[in-house]
Design a protein with these regions (language model features):
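S-adenosylmethionine/decaboxylated-SAM
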Residues: 1-129
């Protein structure tokens, strides 16, 4: 597992930090561990899909943010955090790694600090109260 993570990290750095992945590949990866019938997929750029209210689910139980940049993370929070149910989990994949993601989260919550659980050097987890 460690070696695979190291290879992935090396690959990411080599590719300027970002990879593209088809929706089909995402579904194939998820189907190994989850029933994808209960997962809402929305293909497209964050700026396009999340600013269109018809694309948004009414309630979210698990919200995973993994877009790295300030603007996309800000849009995710603005449009999705209010839909996260009480007791729901938000995972911020790149809080400790990408400055844009961290700044967007810090700006969004401002003085109203949530408790972010430290998962590892990059990931933080929040349980909505």
């Amino acid at each position: 597992m460690r070696n695979r993570h190291r290879q992935c990290t090396t690959s990411i750095k080599k590719n300027i930090g970002f990879t593209e992945c088809s929706l089909n590949k995402v579904k194939k990866n998820l189907i190994k561990n989850a029933n994808i019938d209960n997962i809402f997929f929305n293909k497209g750029k964050v700026e396009d899909t999340l600013n269109n209210k018809k694309n948004l689910p009414k309630k979210i139980s698990i919200l995973r943010l993994d877009t790295d940049f300030y603007e996309s993370t800000k849009i995710e929070l603005k449009n999705l955090f209010s839909r996260l149910v009480k007791g729901g989990i938000m995972i911020i994949d790149d809080y400790g790694f990408w400055k844009g993601a961290r700044k967007a989260v810090d700006d969004y919550f401002g003085d109203y600090r949530q408790f972010f659980h430290y998962v590892d050097h990059s990931c933080r987890l929040l349980i909505k109260k």
